[in-house]
Amino acid sequence: MVMTIEALKHLGRVDESRVGRTEPLPLDNRHYVNGHPLCDSFPGLALIQFGLGCFWGAERLFWQLPGVFSTAAGYAGGGVPYPTYREVCSGETGHAEVVLVVYDHTVISFEQLLQTFWESHDPTQGMRQGNDIGTQYRSVIHCTTSEQYAAASASREVYQQQLNTAGYTAITTEILHPAPPFYYAENEHQQYLAKHPNGYCGLGGTGVTCAIRLQV
């Protein structure tokens, strides 16, 4: 079962009176690795949000790909605006840790991004990734276009068949369009593993290749 924010509210996990704020958290609007802006209108570029566990390792995964212009760690899919890391980790906001990926679709295809996403975590684990347990670690794809949504949904069906063959259970990844609001995480979490090369990274895939041919 995919746990939506509505379900979290029903279970009493989101307390809008105690968390969130009306103003964005302070942000150093410069990517620590490539110097590009973290927050911009990004004309001519495409945006997508991926959640695949702890955003420290997930962000590094994507900024290393040719054609990715910028990345940012943040929170999305919850019930309150501008949460903090501490609030998200408490389970009271319903947000997932996600990475905003800004990419040039003439250099890297959405299919390549999807393959990286599926192969780099276990999308069958529900509210956890490995030793990281909590609603914030759930697997999500938040799409900014209907084309992304169609491609992501198709890729999930294809990868589910491949996982079935390998003995895995049902994919729990939630795919949404339109994408919910993205709230930038605190500066200390942006490009964390570039600032702390020996820092924690809990990413781990299933070992099952995602052989999709979507031409997107």
Curated annotation (Swiss-Prot):
As its record notes, the protein acts as a catalyst of: L-methionyl-[protein] + [thioredoxin]-disulfide + H2O = L-methionyl-(S)-S-oxide-[protein] + [thioredoxin]-dithiol; [thioredoxin]-disulfide + L-methionine + H2O = L-methionine (S)-S-oxide + [thioredoxin]-dithiol
Q: Name one Pfam family in it.
A: PMSR
Might you report a single GO cellular component term? cytoplasm
Entry keyword set: Oxidoreductase
Catalytic residues as annotated in Swiss-Prot or TrEMBL? C54
Q: What is its EC number?
A: 1.8.4.11
* Single GO term (MF): L-methionine-(S)-S-oxide reductase activity
Q: Which GO terms describe its biological process?
A: cellular response to oxidative stress; protein modification process
List, alphabetically, the InterPro entries matched. Met_Sox_Rdtase_MsrA_dom (IPR002569), Met_Sox_Rdtase_MsrA_sf (IPR036509), MsrA_MetSO_reductase (IPR050162)
Q: What class of enzyme is it?
A: oxidoreductase
- Job description of the protein: Has an important function as a repair enzyme for proteins that have been inactivated by oxidation. Catalyzes the reversible oxidation-reduction of methionine sulfoxide in proteins to methionine.
The text of the family note is: Belongs to the MsrA Met sulfoxide reductase family.
Query: What's the protein here called?
Result: Peptide methionine sulfoxide reductase MsrA
Lineage, opening ranks: Bacteria, Pseudomonadati, Pseudomonadota, Gammaproteobacteria, Lysobacterales
